[in-house]
């Protein structure tokens, strides 16, 4: 059984294609299950992820693919999140709309700082040693 539970689409800014594109490829490659799991939007942080305004269309696009291709492949609704305690209530609400959540570790804070750093943009020795 071939499965993939970690996929992204154009909304994150570092992948291409829409949900249906990924579903078609998965079917052609013989996958039985596919999780659509783009980077979750979060309040006040927009780097490498969809915008909050895109979330509704993202979920709708997955639901449409589930209806259209459900007889060929099992499609799951998911998001990849960065965890920060102050976003817990937001994530609790998101979980109600999803089949699962992936924890990604692409963003972090340095103790004593309020700023969120992206792991993709680490360029100072003190960040690496933190």
Residue ranges and their predicted role:
Residues 34-36, 101:
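Hydrophobic residues within beta-strands of alpha/beta enzymes
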């Amino acid at each position: 059984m071939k499965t993939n539970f970690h996929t992204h689409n154009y909304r994150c800014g570092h992948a291409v294609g829409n949900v249906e594109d990924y579903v078609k490829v998965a079917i052609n490659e013989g996958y039985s299950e596919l999780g659509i799991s783009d980077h979750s939007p979060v309040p006040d942080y927009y780097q490498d992820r969809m915008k909050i305004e895109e979330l509704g269309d993202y979920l709708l696009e997955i639901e449409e693919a589930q209806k259209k291709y459900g007889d060929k492949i099992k499609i799951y609704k998911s998001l990849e999140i960065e965890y920060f305690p102050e976003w817990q209530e937001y994530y609790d609400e998101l979980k109600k709309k999803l089949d699962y959540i992936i924890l990604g570790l692409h963003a972090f804070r340095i103790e004593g700082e309020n700023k969120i750093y992206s792991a993709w943009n680490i360029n100072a020795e003190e960040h690496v040693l933190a």
